[in-house]
Amino acid sequence: MSSGGLLLLLGLLTLWEGLTPVSSKDRPEFCELPADSGSCKGNFQAFYYHPVHRTCLEFIYGGCEGNANNFKTIDECKRTCAA
């Protein structure tokens, strides 16, 4: 195979890896944590991964504390936790 073909194959494999969903064995442990609004009284839209439903759901984040299962966008939640 030519070096150009190898580079193309490597590029396609890299793209495939980036688009492949996270498997449960590769999912960070914090994705299993419940939604936690924290102790502050803000009203911010956030998203968390719900392990039973295996999807990302919206919740209201108070603005401080909480836990790591807290994402600003649903896409960020899906990239990190969704299988």
UniProtKB/Swiss-Prot annotation:
Extract one GO cellular component term from the record: extracellular space
Q: Which GO terms describe its molecular function?
A: serine-type endopeptidase inhibitor activity
* Superkingdom assignment: Eukaryota
Signal sequence extent:
1-24
Q: List localization entries.
A: Secreted
- Keyword flag Transport: no
Tell me where in this chain the BPTI/Kunitz inhibitor domain is found. 31-81
Which residue pairs form cystines in this protein?
C31-C81, C40-C64, C56-C77
The annotated site for Reactive bond for trypsin falls at K41, G42
Which keywords label this protein?
A: Disulfide bond, Protease inhibitor, Secreted, Serine protease inhibitor, Signal
Q: Summarize the protein's role.
A: Serine protease inhibitor.
Protein name per UniProt: Blackelin-5
Which organism is the protein's source? Pseudechis porphyriacus (Red-bellied black snake)
Organism lineage string: Eukaryota, Metazoa, Chordata, Craniata, Vertebrata
